[in-house]
UniProtKB/Swiss-Prot annotation:
GO terms for molecular function: toxin activity. It is found in: Secreted. Its main location: secreted. It comes from Scolopendra viridicornis nigra. This is Scolopendra 6940.74 Da toxin.
Length: 13
């Protein structure tokens, strides 16, 4: 979920 990066930056990316 790339959208989750907005809430948790550094988690998915």
């Amino acid at each position: 979920f790339k959208s989750l990066t907005k809430y948790s930056p550094g988690r998915q990316n």
